[in-house]
């Protein structure tokens, strides 16, 4: 069930899963254009067509009564787990630097940077084959820590027009009260351009399917976006001392997300590769989402046997995975070799689901090789920065000649004269 292939084949398969069909992109553009043109009517029409929900009957914005009912439906144990996760996420993100600064030079010139939170953001939380209250916390809590004033959350409704109670409770626990029953490209367009019932946002963050990702790409420039996140993925680097059943379980934890998810073991130990493959087959039998996981592993899963851990690190860096587990004897000694990864998990007890739910860092991470240049969602995702320049007369005179020389070298006489006038 876990194909034994080489690194080149893994890279070929992983790149192929991210190629969007033009038909999907065209459909996304069609939906966005309709929402821009028709507003709320288009959102409601596509929700009926694609999700099978009549928002006129189900209600578009979640009410206080719905949130109250959700609390009554959630067990005390689950509520406690949500609150522990929320607090861990908040604690982690409060440690992230976000301060403004100013410095005064010897000539009196003041330079600085002013950091401010975005005024209004839209968060997308996926639905479909599973509900993700954890994604609510992983996006909303960092936004709250950053100081965002208004947060609008969009998530697709279930067939009966409701949202999962645990998702609603997670939103309430994160301080989000503006929740809309909409998903897909129509939700992204509504957040970006606004409708009669949704005020436009400054930025859209959160993971979604190919329609959501392409829609975010289309509206970028009208609003900012966090990243273009694709299917989930994990790379486990393990040596011969790793437990095959633990490695297999971690691979399956990502494979069960989506048929397009990628799960790869890289090891210098051929015996471990075989044992993990056998464990994957055994554990699949008891997995409720085994059909999804089986398709994922058949198409985008792999065990790759390499010559040593150095070669394993090279392959992992070229894949730039969303999640990278270092399940080796001395993981800290290999940390410095990691160049590209969204999140890094060190040692046998740092199982990937720890990051998905409770540790503290956001689980919204770069995928599809974009960890080469994207960073995880964080407080910084929800901040904007302004440069500050305050020059006095002495500082101006010291700089004036250089500015005029550079401006005239670029053929921008107006720039030079703006400086020259102040010297007179």
Swiss-Prot record:
Zn(2+) binds at residues 254, 257, 356, 415. NAD(+) binds at residues 124, 186, 209. CDD domains: Histidinol_dh (cd06572). One of its GO terms (cellular component) is cytosol. Keywords: Amino-acid biosynthesis, Histidine biosynthesis, Metal-binding, NAD, Oxidoreductase, Zinc. It holds the Pfam family Histidinol_dh. NCBIfam families: hisD. Catalyzes the sequential NAD-dependent oxidations of L-histidinol to L-histidinaldehyde and then to L-histidine. This is Histidinol dehydrogenase. The lineage of its organism: Bacteria, Bacillati, Bacillota, Clostridia, Moorellales.
């Amino acid at each position: 069930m876990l194909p034994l292939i080489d690194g080149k084949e893994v890279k070929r398969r992983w790149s192929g899963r991210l190629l969007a069909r033009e038909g999907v992109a065209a459909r996304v553009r069609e939906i966005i254009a309709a929402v821009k043109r028709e507003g709320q009517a288009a959102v409601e029409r596509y929700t009926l067509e694609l999700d099978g929900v009549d928002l006129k009957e189900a209600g578009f914005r979640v009410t206080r009564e719905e949130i109250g009912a959700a609390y009554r439906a959630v067990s005390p144990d689950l509520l406690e787990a949500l609150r522990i996760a929320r607090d861990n996420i908040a604690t982690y993100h409060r440690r992230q630097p976000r301060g403004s600064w100013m410095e005064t030079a010897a000539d009196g010139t003041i330079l600085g940077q002013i950091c401010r939170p975005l005024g209004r953001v839209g968060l997308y939380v996926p639905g479909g084959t599973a509900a993700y209250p954890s994604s609510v916390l992983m996006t909303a809590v960092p936004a709250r820590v950053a100081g965002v004033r208004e947060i609008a959350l969009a998530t697709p409704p279930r067939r009966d027009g409701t949202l999962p109670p645990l998702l609603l409770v997670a939103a309430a626990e994160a301080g989000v009260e503006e929740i809309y029953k909409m998903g897909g490209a129509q939700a992204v367009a509504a957040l970006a351009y606004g409708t009669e019932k949704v005020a436009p946002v400054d930025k859209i963050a959160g993971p979604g399917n190919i329609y959501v990702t392409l829609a975010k790409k289309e509206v970028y420039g009208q609003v900012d976006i966090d990243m273009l996140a694709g299917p989930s993925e994990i790379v486990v680097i393990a040596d011969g001392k790793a437990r095959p059943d633990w490695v297999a379980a971690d691979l399956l934890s990502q494979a069960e997300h989506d048929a397009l998810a990628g799960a790869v073991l890289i090891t210098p130990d051929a015996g471990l590769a075989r044992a993990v493959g056998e464990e994957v087959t055994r554990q699949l039998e008891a997995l409720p989402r085994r059909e999804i996981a089986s398709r994922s592993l058949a198409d985008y899963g792999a065990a790759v046997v390499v010559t040593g851990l150095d070669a394993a690190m090279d392959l992992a860096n070229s894949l730039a995975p969303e999640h990278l587990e270092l399940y080796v004897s001395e993981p800290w000694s290999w940390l410095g070799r990691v160049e590209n990864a969204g999140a890094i998990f060190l040692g046998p007890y740092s199982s990937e689901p720890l990051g998905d739910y409770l540790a503290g860092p956001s689980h919204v991470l770069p995928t599809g090789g974009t960890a080469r240049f994207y960073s995880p969602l964080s407080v910084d995702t929800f901040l904007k920065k302004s440069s500050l320049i305050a020059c006095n007369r002495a500082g101006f005179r010291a700089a004036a000649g250089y500015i005029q020389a550079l401006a005239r070298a670029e053929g921008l006489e107006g720039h030079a004269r703006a400086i020259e006038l102040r010297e007179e």
